[in-house]
Amino acid sequence: VPLGVPVALGVPPSRPPCRPVNVTVAAEKDECPQCLAVTTTACGGYCRTREPVYRSPLGGPAQQACGYGALRYERLALPGCAPGADPTVAVPVALSCRCARCPMATADCTVAGLGPAFCGAPAGFGPQ
């Protein structure tokens, strides 16, 4: 790394550090026949990890994942919901992100998932 070029949190310059990034997600509910594509911010980027040469019988070091530091929720209404059904959904918006152990009770830190734009509603995204 040239002098004067900082390396954020030990992450090489070729890999962006953990930060809020724009994403498009599919908002859906069981009572509504179609999804709504929503642009929001989520946390993405790399966190410094270490793999020791020596394997301790006490276990390995805690690996960190990029997750929410602070967030707020935006409420949106889905189109075409059944009469009497609540059409509103809450979409998280990342205000800040941080590297920490994955909170397995509230987050999905798997290698690959369905993806944020997956829509399981019968009518999909409806007419565009």
UniProtKB/Swiss-Prot annotation:
Pfam families per UniProt: Cys_knot (PF00007)
Q: Which cysteines are joined by disulfide bonds?
A: 18-66, 32-81, 35-119, 43-97, 47-99, 102-109
Cellular-component GO terms for this entry: cytoplasm; extracellular space
GO terms classed as biological process = estradiol secretion; G protein-coupled receptor signaling pathway
Gene Ontology MF, one: hormone activity
Record keywords, A-Z: Disulfide bond, Glycoprotein, Hormone, Secreted
- The highest taxon in the source lineage is Eukaryota
Q: Which sites does the entry annotate for glycosylation?
A: 22
The entry describes its oligomerization and partners as: Heterodimer of a common alpha chain and a unique beta chain which confers biological specificity to thyrotropin, lutropin, follitropin and gonadotropin.
Q: Per its database record, what is this protein's job?
A: Promotes spermatogenesis and ovulation by stimulating the testes and ovaries to synthesize steroids.
Q: Name the protein family.
A: Belongs to the glycoprotein hormones subunit beta family.
Please identify the protein, giving its name as recorded: Lutropin subunit beta
